[in-house]
Amino acid sequence: LFIAHDLAVVRHFSQRVAVMYLGKIIEIGDRASIYTRPRHPYTHALLSAVPEVSVAGESAGPRERIRLAGDVPSPISPPSGCRFRTRCWKAQDRCAAEEPPLIRVSGNREGHLTACHFPEDPTTEARAEDIVLDPALAALEEGGH
């Protein structure tokens, strides 16, 4: 178990990733699926803050940063329904009325679950070459020692 707020670091240490908001898991899946096809708006916002670097080590260009409006609600007294709804640009009445279950959304890979009534469309196709691993971690994943 590796807990961090820095998704740029999490990418290099984890095979499965769970994204939490106010103490609840709102998205969980394998690393490639979360980083290349995030479905929860909060996951999109978090990933928009991760700097992009090209293979040559130069900036890959500007990424549209999602800035969340409003204050973070109290975890002691979270809002009704979806805990992220007070800061979500997709929130509707249903989000306040019922908490979204953590389910597999159409288009997600097996094991990629999202808790959102109005999930984001996948923004990219999952490609293994998009994930650059530390060589030691890559060797472990390939069965090396």
Predicted regions and their residues:
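A short, surface-exposed alpha-helical micro-motif characterized by mixed small hydrophobic
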Residues: 10-12
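H-loop/switch region of ABC-family ATPase nucleotide-binding domains
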Residues: 4-5
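Charged, flexible cofactor/metal-binding loops and thiol motifs
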Residues: 30-144
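Short, glycine/charged-rich "phosphate-handling" switch motifs in NTP-dependent
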Residues: 16, 28
